Amino acid sequence: MSAAMSEVRIAAEPRTEFGKGGARRTRRAGKVPAVLYGHGKPPRHIALPAHDLLHAFKTDAGTNVLLTLELAEGTELALAKDVQRHPIKGSFEHIDLVLVARGEKVVADIPVQVIGEPHPDTLVDQQVTTIAVKADATRLPGPIEVDITGLEPGTSILARQLVLPAGSELDADPDLVVVQCLAKRTNAQQEASLGETPVAEEAGVASASV
């Protein structure tokens, strides 16, 4: 696992229309409505090219990619704080961006990726898909790998056991359960469970006919 170094330049233009109608017109023009805030500066309403934003988020860093925004007044570094997508189409609806500076520590939700094969009798239950990590804004880690090779039922992996790259630190409950290993149901247990279903149904029918 290595720190995510992806950085993408993207042109931003000021937005002059607000509200739902203005946002719809912005999206129809192939742009994504966004708000840029942080560092004590007043919020700035901007629009970003949807195609460029999609390309940026397809890097290894995902939505944690460092964006260099090209504004009329100069460039700014920013990270996506909240990404809203259309529930059906998946297209971008709105983006909240937070200003960052090189060398500044920020907290970001980093994806957790399970790798390896557990013991044959083990059923793996991944409790969380992301974990809060504090790191330099320009060196946010990529996906954090959790190796489950050979793990047996009854084993758990906690947040404090995750291996983070140098310069990164956990910003979540250290006792948070990330992965839990359960025992697979045996064939006998599955058959017994299936065998109970008709009995329960028959009992229900019998009681209903009384």
Swiss-Prot record:
GO biological process, one term: translation
UniProt keyword terms in alphabetical order: Ribonucleoprotein, Ribosomal protein, RNA-binding, rRNA-binding
GO cellular component: cytosolic large ribosomal subunit
SUPFAM superfamilies xref list: Ribosomal protein L25-like
InterPro entries found in the cross-reference section: Rbsml_bL25/Gln-tRNA_synth_N, Ribosomal_bL25/Gln-tRNA_synth, Ribosomal_bL25_b-dom, Ribosomal_bL25_C, Ribosomal_bL25_long, Ribosomal_L25_dom, Ribosomal_uL5_bac-type
Superkingdom field: Bacteria
GO molecular function, one term: structural constituent of ribosome
Role, per record: This is one of the proteins that binds to the 5S RNA in the ribosome where it forms part of the central protuberance.
Self-association state and partner proteins as the record states: Part of the 50S ribosomal subunit; part of the 5S rRNA/L5/L18/L25 subcomplex. Contacts the 5S rRNA. Binds to the 5S rRNA independently of L5 and L18.
Family, as annotated: Belongs to the bacterial ribosomal protein bL25 family. CTC subfamily.
Protein's name according to its UniProt entry: Large ribosomal subunit protein bL25
Source organism: Frankia casuarinae (strain DSM 45818 / CECT 9043 / HFP020203 / CcI3)
High-level lineage: Bacteria, Bacillati, Actinomycetota, Actinomycetes, Frankiales
Gene behind this protein: rplY
